[in-house]
């Protein structure tokens, strides 16, 4: 969770905020390390499902589902990636999808974290203590979500 899980949990927090309820299931190694986790959140704006796995290959893609469409972020969604927007035209009487429009973008650039580095450099140069793009409060919420999930899964930290 603390390695790969931060990406899907951060995406959940950025799009829906901290859940009002959260349920987590996971699989622990013999040493008590979480190898795979599923975190389901209930939010005022909808539901979220975040997964991560340490001992297997995953696509690390993301799908955001809305009332009239989806946004799909391709492999390794946490960096610049391919994006596909699908918008459904809904029948006003039944609410059923009657047609669909797709738009694709390729936002891939080598590296992937240069935007974060540029924002950090900008804020440090300006003498700012935090970024409004991802304020400390958002970082704390992500950590609280992960801590709650890890506790539910059964991860225990050694006491020294």
Question: At which residue positions do the language-model features occur?
Answer:
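C-terminal helix-rich "cap/oligomerization" subdomain common to oxidoreductases
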Residues: 119-160
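A general structural signal for well-ordered alpha-helical segments in protein cores
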Residues: 8-9, 82, 114-121, 143-146
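Surface loops and adjacent helix of pleckstrin homology
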Residues: 53, 74-76
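A short local loop/turn or secondary-structure capping micro-motif enriched for an aromatic residue
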Residues: 30, 56-60, 80-83, 109-113
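Rossmann-like dinucleotide-binding domain that binds NAD(P)(H)
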Residues: 1-59, 63, 140
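Structural motif
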Residues: 47, 68-70
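Short polybasic amphipathic segments
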Residues: 62-64, 79-96
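Active-site loop of classical SDR/Rossmann-like NAD(P)-dependent oxidoreductases
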Residues: 105-118, 134
């Amino acid at each position: 969770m603390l390695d790969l899980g931060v990406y899907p949990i951060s995406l959940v927090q950025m799009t829906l905020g901290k859940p009002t309820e959260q349920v987590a299931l996971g699989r622990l190694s013999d040493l008590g390390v979480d190898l795979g986790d599923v975190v389901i959140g209930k939010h005022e704006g909808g539901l979220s499902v975040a997964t991560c796995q340490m001992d297997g290959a995953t696509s690390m893609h993301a799908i955001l589902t809305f009332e009239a469409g989806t946004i799909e972020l391709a492999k390794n969604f946490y960096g610049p990636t391919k994006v596909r927007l699908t918008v459904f035209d809904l029948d006003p009487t039944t609410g059923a999808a009657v047609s669909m429009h797709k738009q694709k973008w390729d936002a891939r650039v080598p590296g992937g974290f240069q935007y974060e580095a540029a924002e950090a450099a900008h804020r440090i140069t300006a003498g700012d203590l935090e970024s409004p793009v991802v304020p400390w409060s958002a970082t704390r919420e992500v950590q609280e979500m992960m801590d709650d999930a890890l506790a539910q899964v059964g991860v225990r930290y050694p006491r020294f």
